[in-house]
């Protein structure tokens, strides 16, 4: 018996659940932006190739506590360097962080992975060849005429929310051609706290205008005042209605000058 059979894992049911989860995640990424969807396809290409490389080298890491694909990316996909780093962490962490051989997997597993890679490569190439982005075009077209219309945007400030850092980068690149854009994510929120407050919090003692647009992920969806702005754009819409209300609550605060 294969190792996973000895451990009595329900492979088929787990596989079906993962398929549904991946489908949902890809739909959400596509809903966010074309840029985010392409980034996800590119990640899937790398993840699939990483697995194929590990099978070829007879060194397959399955480590719940280690970002195996992240280690490959850090090593610029140098197999020896990546696997050395993974093995070092695996030994330190122990637990369920395991290394398998290719013989622990079904004989047709590699063939199926190779087929997956061909499909993903084809999808990525087709999406990369198409430069059209109607959603981003509509955003750029409405940026000054609608979102910064002085009749509705009386403060000259704009808050943009997105669930994806890839989408955030694309928005900032386009909007940054005419506006001063502040990008905030989990990676830099703490170091930008004073800047955020001075530029977007109506209650701040120091008021600055270094930025007129803040593009943020969900990291600022709660626990922060952004009410110097009275216009919010949800570039993508969270499926959780509570999260949407939390976003809107960033500008609907006591102290706002907006009517």
Where on the chain are the PLM-derived regions?
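Helicase motor interdomain insertion/brace
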Residues: 1-187, 192-198, 222
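Conserved RecA-like P-loop NTPase helicase motor core
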Residues: 176-259
